Amino acid sequence: MFKINLGDFMLIRPRRLRKNQKIRDLVRETILTKNDLIMPIFVDENLKGNEKKEISSMPNQYRFSVEGAIEEAKEIADLGIPAVILFGIPKHKDEIASSAYDKNGVVQRTIRGIKEELGDELLVIADCCLCEYTSHGHCGIVKDGKILNDATLPILAKIALSYADAGVDIVAPSDMMDGRVRAIREILEENGYDDVAIMSYSAKYASSFYGPFREAAESAPKFGDRKSYQMDIGNAREALKEIALDIEEGADLILVKPALPYLDIIRMAKDRFDVPIGGYCVSGEYAMVEAAARNGWLDREKVIYEILLSIKRAGADFIITYWAKEVAEIGLSQE
């Protein structure tokens, strides 16, 4: 009789579940789909008609006119991507970011145009900040070289209200002022916009990965830096405190920015909080991959897929990425 000696072979061989693509697909733990993605759109008030302008540090990414942004949103919706996030570049900048809450501002007109064309077929998120609209490029009111927290809150609230008046689905404060979520939630409730959600950039780090975005949005600070309000890159527990405060103040969704260097923060937040959590795959991450790919140093499509999958695997429920259209159009795979 044949006898099995358990010492002669391995009972557990993880490679059995890797031997071909079908079995790998069957047991894959994390799957990336277009429903996970949000596409950014830069809307430039200085552009007319269907004019668009390529962003030099972000190949294949553009600033659009209002009309062009509406057409771009229609293309995005047709691809099955569920949401866009809008960033505005105004004609006029001043010390108090007055163009940011103008009812006929560049973002407000774009929101109305998208909603008139698409209704609920596409979620419209609007970034809520001052930096693109201030003459000094900071995310708050400045006095004597200091960024004032409490003086900034009413302006952020006015911006959010103007977006809600235009028909936005979600407002996304990215300024990192203390108390901004409460200020926004209160003004929305007072004006009957209880169904407008807040996606707070709760853990937004003072990162070096934002450089290309600041060119795209013309939002670089004219003096100093943003380290007095954006988070220190070495801190993790502080991120959890920021997230907890924003949820307590009324945030419906929270965002970690950047995503790839802060996957640990996404994972910690996912384990701790019961709200949808997103990661922003930022301009520097995009530019880094595109530059390396142009030099033939890596397999572009596989790297994009791996980056986005890693963000989801870390715990992100949604991902803001400049590759959203491409992923939806052609699909990407690790194989």
UniProtKB/Swiss-Prot annotation:
EC numbers, comma separated: 4.2.1.24
Amino-acid positions noted as binding Mg(2+) in the UniProt annotation, renumbered to this chain: 242
Superkingdom classification of source: Archaea
Enzyme class (EC, first level): lyase
Alphabetical list of CDD domains matching this protein: ALAD_PBGS
InterPro entries the record matches: ALAD, ALAD_AS, Aldolase_TIM
Keywords: Heme biosynthesis, Lyase, Magnesium, Metal-binding, Porphyrin biosynthesis, Zinc
Any one biological process term the GO annotation gives: protoporphyrinogen IX biosynthetic process
Positions bound to Zn(2+): 129, 131, 139
Listed GO CC annotations: cytosol
The keyword Metal-binding belongs to this UniProt entry's keyword annotation: yes
Active site: 204, 257
Cofactor: Zn(2+)
Positions annotated to bind 5-aminolevulinate 2: 283, 322
Cofactor note: Binds 1 zinc ion per monomer.
GO molecular function: porphobilinogen synthase activity; zinc ion binding
Amino acids binding 5-aminolevulinate 1: 214, 226
Pathway assigned in UniProt: Porphyrin-containing compound metabolism; protoporphyrin-IX biosynthesis; coproporphyrinogen-III from 5-aminolevulinate: step 1/4
Pfam families: ALAD
Catalytic activities: 2 5-aminolevulinate = porphobilinogen + 2 H2O + H(+)
Function: Catalyzes an early step in the biosynthesis of tetrapyrroles. Binds two molecules of 5-aminolevulinate per subunit, each at a distinct site, and catalyzes their condensation to form porphobilinogen.
Family note: Belongs to the ALAD family.
NCBIfam families in alphabetical order: PRK09283.1
Protein name: Delta-aminolevulinic acid dehydratase
Organism listed in the record: Methanocaldococcus jannaschii (strain ATCC 43067 / DSM 2661 / JAL-1 / JCM 10045 / NBRC 100440) (Methanococcus jannaschii)
Lineage: Archaea, Methanobacteriati, Methanobacteriota, Methanomada group, Methanococci
Gene symbol of the encoding locus: hemB
